[in-house]
């Protein structure tokens, strides 16, 4: 682009390189942040990543909601509704994992704290579980589901909110006192 800022549509086009199952070996496909200024919902990029995983049938897409759905939203009920609406706007597939948000972490390269989407962490947990256990073991829970480097979560759903998110195909990430994230 001429302004050096890629839109979600341009990023979705770049993801099309992953459609080639013969030349591209792929197990985990990360969406990254689900929002840029040109596509406030993030649906374009998330849908493209999900479509690739669904078509290939040999990988899993990892999706986080749009940053504005959870970061800077003071009310947890609104965050729950936002995340559910985001997930409901995406196609349904067995080849994608949608998580509930962003973690606040220290960026040692820029010496600042920032919010980062959890889809990279979720994919990392899946990769780690595959290496220490077997692919059919859950990467969640207190033993295998610890998110590293999280200072806090932008959205820490309670039990009722987690139940609502499960119904919307969202895998909630929560912080439990004494257990971590």
Model-derived features: where do they sit?
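A glycine- and small-residue-enriched flexible loop/hinge signal that marks low-structured segments
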Residues: 1-181
């Amino acid at each position: 682009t001429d302004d050096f800022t890629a839109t979600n549509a341009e990023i979705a086009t770049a993801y099309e390189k992953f459609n080639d199952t013969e030349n591209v070996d792929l197990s985990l496909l990360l969406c990254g942040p689900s929002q840029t200024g040109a596509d406030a919902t993030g649906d374009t990029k998330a849908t493209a990543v999900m479509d690739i995983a669904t078509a290939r049938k040999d990988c899993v897409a990892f999706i986080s909601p749009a940053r504005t759905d959870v970061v800077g939203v003071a009310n947890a009920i609104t965050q729950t509704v936002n995340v559910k609406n985001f997930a409901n706007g995406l196609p349904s597939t067995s080849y994608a994992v949608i998580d509930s948000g962003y973690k606040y972490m220290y960026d040692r390269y820029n010496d600042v704290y920032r919010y980062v989407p959890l889809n990279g962490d979720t994919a990392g947990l899946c990769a780690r579980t595959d290496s220490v256990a077997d692919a059919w073991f859950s990467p969640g829970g207190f033993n295998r589901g610890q998110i590293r480097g999280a200072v806090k979560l932008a959205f820490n759903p309670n039990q009722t909110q987690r139940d609502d998110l499960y119904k919307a195909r969202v895998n909630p990430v929560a912080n439990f006192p004494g257990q971590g994230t």
